[in-house]
C-alpha cells in the first residue's frame, strides 16, 4: 500500500507541476494567455477525445470551442519531469506560431488562446456550428463538384501553412479536421498539438495505447512515414509531402464516405498490423492507390486528380503550389471537353433538349458509385416488355436438379462452418494447454524458490518450519513469487508486441535478421528467406488486388463520438 500511495503522489505532482509551468511561461500580459474565464458560459459538450473533452461555450455575443485538456494523461509513473517540460516548451512555441498565423488566413481555424490555473487547462478556438466534412458525410453523400471544391480550399490552406517560415506540417489531414463555415467554405483544424504534448516520452505501456489510437488514422498516413524507423506515432517522421498524401486519402473519403481500403479490413485492430507490415515488407507487395481501384466509377476529372496525388515517392509527389496549378488545369481541360461534346451533339427537338438539360445538371454534381444516367420512359417500357417476353420464353427447370443444387449449396456451407468450429475448438484447447503449462511452470518455479529459502533458513537457525505460522508465510511467499513472475512475463510480452507493431525489433542487440535462404527442418520450411520471398513476389502481381472481407455499414465508422468532435482543435 505505501508503494501505491507514493506512486499516486508522484503522478498527481506531475500534472500539478505542468500547470505551474504553464502559469509561469504564460504571464498575464501574454497575448496568447486568456486571463479569466468568468465571462465564459458553458453551453454543451461537443464530444470527448483521447486527450480531453471539447465543449461549446458562450463568450458575450460569440460562441467558442473550448478544449478541456485531460491532465491525467500525464499521470504515469514513467513520465520524466524534464521530458514533460521540454515537450511543453515545444507545445507553447508551436501554439504561439499558430496563434499568430491563423488570424492572418481565412482557411485556418483561429486559435484564440490558452487559459490555465492551478487546476485546469483550456484551449480556446473558433466555433463553427456546421461541424466538419465528416459530420456532413454522415447525413449525405457529397457530389464530385462539392468534393473538388473542398479539396481545392484545403489545398489553399496547406499551401499557406507549407510556405510559412518555418513551414507548418499538419500531420493529421482527414475529413474530421476539415470544418465547414456558414458560407460553405473549408477551414483547417486540429493540428495535434495536445497529442504531441502527451505522446513523446511515454513508457512502453502508454506508447502501446497511443499507437492503438492511431488505428483508423493510419489509413491516411503516407507510405514513407509508415516505413520510417521513427514510425507514424512520432511527429519527426512527417515531412511536407505526407500532408499531400493524407489530402488524397481525405478526397477519397469525401467521395466514398471512407478512407482508402477501409472496407477491406475485417476489424479496425487489423489496420496497424497490415499497413505497417506491407510498408516494411521486403517482398515488394504494396496496397494499390490508383484511380481504377479506388474510384473506378468516377469521372475522368476525379480519376486524374487521384492519380496526381497518390505518387508513392515523396520526391515526385507534387507540392501544394504545383497541385493547385495542375488541378485547375485538369478542371479547365474537363470543362473544354464538355463544351466540345455539347457542340458536336446538336439538339434536334424539345424532348431531347429537356432530357439533355436534366442529364447535364445531374452530371455536374454526380455521386461516385451511383448511376448518373436517367433513361426515357419509353425505353423503360420497352425494357419491361422485353423482360416479360424473355421470362415467358424460358423453359421450366428441372425441380429435382434444383433440389440437388440447393442441397449441395447448403451442405457445403454447413461443412465449412463445422471446419471453422473444429479449428476454433482446437485453438481453444491449445490455448488452454499452453496457459495451464505456463501457469504451472510459474507455480513450480515459485515453489522451488520458496523451498530453497526455507532450506537455507532451516540450516542457519535450526527452526521447525513446519509450524502453522511458517507454513502460512511460505504460502504467501509462493503466491507473491507467482504474481511477480506473471507480471514480468506480461510486461515483456507487452514490450515485444509494441516493438513488433512498430517494426523496431532491429534496434535490439539480440536481433537476428531474416536469412537469405529459407531454413528447412524435416522437409518443412520454418523460416522463409529473403530470396524465396522475392521470388514468390515476382510470380505475383506487384499490387495486391484485395477482395472485401467484410461488408459493413460505414456510417458506424463516421458516427464515433469517442474519436472526438469536428470542432476539436487539438
From Swiss-Prot:
Biological process, per Gene Ontology: defecation; MAPK cascade; neuron projection morphogenesis; regulation of MAPK cascade; rhythmic process
Domain named Protein kinase: residues: 40-331
Catalytic machinery residues: 172
PROSITE patterns recorded: PROTEIN_KINASE_ATP, PROTEIN_KINASE_DOM, PROTEIN_KINASE_ST
Knockout consequences: RNAi-mediated knockdown increases lifespan, probably via nhr-8 downstream up-regulation of genes involved in the xenobiotic detoxification pathway, such as cytochrome p450 cyp-35b1. Results in increased lifespan with less lipofuscin accumulation and better motility, independent of simultaneous RNAi-mediated knockdown of hsf-1. Delays reproductive span and reduces brood size, mainly when grown on E.coli HT115 and not OP50. Increases the phosphorylation of pmk-1 in a sek-1 dependent manner.
Result after altering residue 248 to R: In sa201; induces very short defecation cycle periods
Reaction catalyzed: L-seryl-[protein] + ATP = O-phospho-L-seryl-[protein] + ADP + H(+); L-threonyl-[protein] + ATP = O-phospho-L-threonyl-[protein] + ADP + H(+)
Subcellular location as annotated: Membrane
Keywords: ATP-binding, Biological rhythms, Kinase, Membrane, Nucleotide-binding, Serine/threonine-protein kinase, Transferase, Transmembrane, Transmembrane helix
Region: Disordered, residue numbers: 338-369, 550-570
Consequence recorded when altering residue 494 to R: In u7; weak antimorph that induces very short defecation cycle periods
Membrane topology value: Multi-pass membrane protein
Entry GO terms, CC: cytoplasm; plasma membrane
InterPro entries from the UniProt entry: Kinase-like_dom_sf, Prot_kinase_dom, Protein_kinase_ATP_BS, Ser/Thr_kinase_AS, STE20/SPS1-PAK
Described purpose of this protein according to its UniProt entry: Probable serine-threonine protein kinase involved in the control of defecation rhythms. Required to increase the length of defecation cycle period. Acts in a cell-functional rather than developmental aspect in the regulation of defecation rhythms. Prevents preferential activation of the p38 MAPK pathway in response to the levels of vitamin B12 in different food types during larval development, thereby regulating the expression of cytoprotective genes, modulating life span and stress tolerance.
Protein name: Serine/threonine-protein kinase flr-4
Organism of origin: Caenorhabditis elegans
